Amino acid sequence: MTAFRVLVADKVKAQLYDLPSRRSSLKALQSFVNPAGMQPERALGSGRPGRVMSGTGGGRHAFQPKHSIKEHAEEVFVRLVIAALETDAAGNGGAPIVLVAAPRLLGTYRRHLPAGLKERVAAEIRLDLTKLPVLELNKRVREAVMALPLSVTSRFRTPRRRGKA
């Protein structure tokens, strides 16, 4: 039997679940909250962008950052969740991972996942399911896991010992 780790996330919160087998129920392992995700961007930083001096002359113009403060806070949160996922992965013996998030956030997770964890991602559900009741979430995740071909999950199985009994 293959146990799965299921990460259900949005910009504000993430929940890590254990799914002991394809037919069992989700068990909550760890919760994460991003307080910056709940606040408007104006509350996270100053109201005006920085100023930059021109090379010659006395002209100045506003400096536009590459990412907004809100996007930066989201990436910091994603890195925090991934660090916890790595710690969990080191202790659970190589369980496959199911990622559940909105498409844009799923891309952020993909971008920041280290190679060792990317190899263990067995399925992705491109929906924001964080607000669903646990029973409905359980149903959706189990449907996705049951739809996986056995060849996908067999590479994560731990070999059984055969010996004299």
Regions found by a protein language model. Give the residues of each.
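Terminal alpha-helical anchor/extension segments at protein ends
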Residues: 1-165
